Regions:
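Pepsin/retropepsin-fold aspartyl endopeptidases
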Residues: 1-115
Length: 115
């Protein structure tokens, strides 16, 4: 499912870059191209090893501000390569309290559980 989102540096929240990507509930993390993140002054905080398409890749990891449906949150992100598509993963959806409505093909507020 395609979605429009805003990306911002939590330390400079007024500068927002509008992007288009896909929501993938099978992806744990959000992937944003490195050039977009670095253009906002977002730096990696660590490097991680991830399984992707049957093999392993190493990518930098950081935190970025994300705007979805008018709400702003800070989410963990993977620094994507030039060929990577922007992906909004399940962790970001949970932080926002959102889920996919498969009938309408949109995002909607999720029923939140307190466990």
């Amino acid at each position: 499912m395609k979605v429009k989102a805003g990306i911002f540096n939590p330390l400079v929240p007024d500068k927002v870059v509008e992007v288009e990507g896909i929501v993938d509930t099978g992806a744990v993390y959000t992937v944003i191209r490195r050039d977009v993140l670095e253009g906002l002054g977002i730096r990696p905080v660590k490097r991680g090893r991830f399984k992707a398409l049957g093999s392993y890749v190493e990518r930098d990891v950081g935190e970025a501000g994300l705007v979805l449906m008018g709400e702003r949150r800070v989410v963990p992100v993977i620094f994507g390569e030039a060929e990577d598509v922007l992906v909004i993963g399940l962790t970001a959806l949970e932080i926002f309290g959102l889920e996919v409505d498969p009938v309408r093909g949109t995002l909607k507020e999720a029923e939140l559980l307190l466990l």
